[in-house]
C-alpha cells in the first residue's frame, strides 16, 4: 500500500507546528517482537514546547506483542489521536476502523500522518494532503518471512526515499532491529528531511558533514514487555534516544549516525 500526495489547504485546529518526520515500524508475527524508529527535523526545544520529553514521547504508540503505530506530520499536541489509537489497538479494533475514527474525529487530520501495524498482519496508513510537498507511506510484508513493515515520512527531497528504505529493510537478512536501523540509514543517505542540514539551527558544536535530522530514536518491544500507564511508557527490551543537544564529542552530529553508534554499542554490551 503506497500513498503520495501534494500539500493542500492547511487544517489548523489542534495542530502543532509542522515538524518533518520519518519513521519505520516492523513486527515479527512469529516472535511478537516490535521495532519502531524515527528521526525528525525538530529541535529539542520545539519538542519541549509541545510538552514532549523526546520524539518518541509524542509520536509512538506501542502495544507489546500486539501492535505498533505512529502519529506524526503535524503532531497532535492534545495527544487525543495517540490515546485513541492506543485504546483501540489494545482492544484489537480493526485498523481501518481506527483510521476511520481518526479521520472523523481529528480536526487537524489534514496535516497528520498516521500508520499502524498489528501482529495478525493487518496494517493501515494515512498521509494527510497538507503534510508537505513530498510525503509518502508504504506498508507490506517481507517476502518469505512473517515480518511486516511500515515506512512513512514527509518533507523528503525526492520520491525515491521511501522505496530505498523499503528495499534496505526487505533485503537485509539480520534481526528485526538491524533491518530497521539499516532502513533508517537508507533514508538518511537519500537526504532525510530536506530542511535539515549542518547549517540549520540549532547548529552542532562539532565538525559536521551531513545532517538530516535533529533528533532520532529506536525502540524494541518484546512480547513479554508491558506498558505502565500510557501508550509508550513501558519497560522495553531496548530504547535508544538521540538529541542534538546531548550528542557527545566522540559521536556524530548527525543523529541517525549516532543512533547507529549507540545501537552497535548496545548490541556489543547486552547480555547474550
Short names for language-model regions:
Residues 19-272:
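N-terminal nucleophile
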Amino acid at each position: 500500500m503506497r500513498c503520495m500526495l501534494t500539500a493542500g489547504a492547511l487544517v489548523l485546529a489542534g495542530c502543532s507546528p509542522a515538524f518533518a518526520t520519518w519513521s519505520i515500524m516492523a513486527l515479527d508475527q512469529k516472535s511478537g517482537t516490535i521495532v519502531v524508529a524515527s528521526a525528525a527535523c525538530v529541535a529539542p526545544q520545539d519538542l519541549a514546547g509541545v510538552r514532549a520529553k523526546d520524539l518518541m514521547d509524542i509520536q509512538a504508540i506501542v502495544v507489546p506483542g500486539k501492535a505498533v503505530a505512529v502519529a506524526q506530520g503535524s503532531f497532535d499536541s492534545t495527544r487525543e489521536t495517540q490515546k485513541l489509537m492506543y485504546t483501540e489497538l489494545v482492544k484489537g479494533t480493526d485498523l481501518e476502523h481506527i483510521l476511520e475514527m481518526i479521520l472523523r474525529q481529528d480536526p487537524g487530520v489534514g496535516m497528520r500522518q498516521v500508520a499502524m501495524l498489528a501482529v495478525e498482519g493487518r496494517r493501515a496508513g494515512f498521509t494527510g494532503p497538507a503534510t508537505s510537498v513530498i510525503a509518502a507511506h508504504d506498508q507490506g510484508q517481507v517476502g518469505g518471512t512473517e515480518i511486516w513493515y511500515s515506512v512513512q515520512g514527509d518533507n523528503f527531497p525526492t520520491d525515491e526515499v521511501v522505496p530505498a528504505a523499503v528495499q534496505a529493510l526487505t533485503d537485509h537478512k539480520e534481526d528485526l532491529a538491524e533491518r530497521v536501523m539499516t532502513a533508517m540509514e537508507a533514508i538518511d543517505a537519500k537526504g532525510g528531511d530536506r530542511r535539515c542540514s549542518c547549517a540549520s539551527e540549532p547548529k552542532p558544536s562539532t565538525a559536521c558533514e551531513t545532517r538530516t535530522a535533529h533528533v532520532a530514536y529506536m525502540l524494541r518491544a518484546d512480547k513479554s514487555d508491558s506498558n505502565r500507564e500510557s501508550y509508550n511508557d513501558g519497560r522495553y527490551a531496548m530504547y535508544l534516544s538521540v538529541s542534538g543537544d546531548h550528542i557527545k564529542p566522540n559521536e556524530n552530529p548527525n543523529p541517525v549516525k549516532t543512533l547507529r553508534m549507540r545501537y552497535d554499542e548496545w548490541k556489543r554490551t547486552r547480555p547474550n
